[in-house]
Amino acid sequence: MFVAMTIHSHRYVVEKSTAGMPLTDAVKLGKEVWERHSCINCHTLHGEGAYFAPEVGNVMTRWGVLDDPEGAFEILDAWMKAQPSGTPGRRQMPHFEITEEEMRGLADFLRWADQTDTQNWPPNDAG
C-alpha cells in the first residue's frame, strides 16, 4: 500500500504540478531573498502570511508584467528603491539593500508565484 501511494503521489506531483513556470535558479534565489528579508512578516503570498501589506501572489498580474521578465524586474526595482515613500498616514515599507541579481531573482520568484494555479485562492484580486 505504501509503495502504491508513493507512486501515485509522485505521478500526481509530476503530472499535475501547479507551477506555470519552471523552478529556475533565479526563482530559488528570489525565494531565498524573500525568506532572508522576512517579506512574509508584512505581506501575504497566496493568502499566507501577515496582512499588514498587500498580497504579492498576484502582484505581477496587477502590474501587467507577468509575461515580461525585464518589465517585472524594472517595476519591482523602481518600487523597492522608492521605499519608504514618506506618504503621511500610509504604512511604510523599509528600504532593503538588495543586489541587482537578487532583485531579478525576487522578480522571477514573484512571477513564478503569480503563475501558480491556486484554484482562485485567495479570492481577492486586489493587493
Could you say what each language-model-derived stretch is?
Residues 1-25, 79, 109-127:
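Post-cleavage N-terminal segment of exported redox proteins
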Residues 18-19, 57-59:
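Short helix/strand-bridging catalytic loops that position acidic/His residues to coordinate divalent metals
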Residues 24-25, 32, 46-50, 58-120:
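Extracytoplasmic electron-transfer domains, predominantly the class I c-type cytochrome c fold
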Residues 31-37:
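Local sequence-structure signature of Cys/Sec-based thiol-disulfide redox active-site neighborhoods
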Residues 39-42:
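Short cysteine clusters
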